[in-house]
Every structure is written in C-alpha cells, then in structure tokens.
C-alpha cells in the first residue's frame, strides 16, 4: 500500500518538477565558520582577508568587512558565499561567528571599557593630573584632591563605537588605585 501511494505521489511530484524540463531551484546550504579577530579589529572595524575551502576543496580568499563595535557572539553574514545552489537556485550564505580578542589592561562591557590607573599617594592627597591610556590615544585626566582608591573616573566617549548606531561611542571607566607604601603608614 505504501508503495502505491509512493508511486502515485512520487510520480506526481516528479512530473511537477520536470514539467518545464528543469528541477526546482534550491538554495545552497548556509556554511558556518568561526572568525577570530583582534581587540583593535573589533573596536575600529576594517577589512580582513580570510581563506576558506569551497565545495570542491579549492581554497578561496574572501574580503570580509568587520564593522566597528562588533563583539564576541555577533555574526557576520556574507550572502551568496555559502554552498552552491542547485537547479538555478541561489547560493547559501556564509555565517561567520565572531570571537573578539582581548587587550591587556582593558575589560570590555558592550561599548564601555574598564581600566585601572595607579597614581602616587601624593597625587591622591593633593590632586593633580595623570596620563590615561585610551584606545583613542592618551588623555590627561584631572585628579581631585582626596580621591580614594577604588574611585572611578569616567572618560566620556573614549570607549568603543556602537555597532547599531555608529554616532554613539561608549565610555571608558578608570578605577583609581593608590599603592600604599609602608613609609606612609608610620606614625
């Protein structure tokens, strides 16, 4: 009984597919791959050449645009760069799953960056200025007299650009550390 239905429906679909002499167009499969990028590539974006092996085992170089602000867990879709379609169907897509590297001294939380800054005890007591490294270059930061170890200084617009809205920059939060030497503790 299954064979009868199989023959009837199989022939029906076979005839339907072959009516105009062609098979139905079928989109190629999407290909998934991991792409490791540097902290700087994630923060500032840019183009990167990657090499992949195609369906025929041939190495293929592709230029990939990395949008500024991308982060680990995001995906870049390259339309038409996946497996070949059949019957005139379009090619599948290449999905690149991003893993962004880290940078010593920086912690990233979305578009904001967190760093630490050691200042001398005398600067903490009397105030002054300190040079702070940012991904956009060094800045001079005002240190208020009496600042406490663990205090945070916000550097507005010194973080990472928002991938969703490139006109928005995150902030850099600098946690002040005041090393205490034993000479300052003597009574």
Regions picked out by a protein language model, each given a short descriptive name:
Residues 61-186:
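Intrinsically disordered, low-complexity linker/assembly segments
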Residues 1-55, 86-91, 95:
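Post-J-domain flank of DnaJ/Hsp40 co-chaperones
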